[in-house]
Amino acid sequence: MNYVKIIEKNKNFIELELVNDDHSLSNLVKEILLAKDGVILASYGVEHPVLDPDTGRYISNPTIMLKTDEKTDAETVLKEALKDIVDLCNKTLEDL
């Protein structure tokens, strides 16, 4: 089961762990965050993945790190980025 674990959170920094995931969502979130004003750092890291015998997918627990400038609230920017991803998915569904 996939879920998100908050590792660290303050006004200008958030680190999340995406448990049992791969590069897909982490990379997308990072790219959307990098386009946002006030973002100083948006990155993700993945330790060596393992093969999930149930799904045949290589999974790991990627961590996403977001750092913002002093004027920008990290949680707000992360929520905006996640909303942008949902909007992109909805637009794609409409266009199909």
UniProtKB/Swiss-Prot annotation:
GO terms for cellular component: cytoplasm; DNA-directed RNA polymerase complex. Its EC number is 2.7.7.6. GO terms for biological process: DNA-templated transcription. Keywords: Cytoplasm, DNA-directed RNA polymerase, Nucleotidyltransferase, Transcription, Transferase. GO terms for molecular function: DNA binding; DNA-directed RNA polymerase activity; protein dimerization activity. Pfam families: RNA_pol_L_2. SUPFAM superfamilies: RBP11-like subunits of RNA polymerase. Gene3D superfamilies: RNA polymerase, RBP11-like subunit. It is found in: Cytoplasm. It comes from the Archaea. Belongs to the archaeal Rpo11/eukaryotic RPB11/RPC19 RNA polymerase subunit family. Part of the RNA polymerase complex. DNA-dependent RNA polymerase (RNAP) catalyzes the transcription of DNA into RNA using the four ribonucleoside triphosphates as substrates. This is DNA-directed RNA polymerase subunit Rpo11. It comes from Methanococcus maripaludis (strain DSM 14266 / JCM 13030 / NBRC 101832 / S2 / LL). The gene is rpo11.
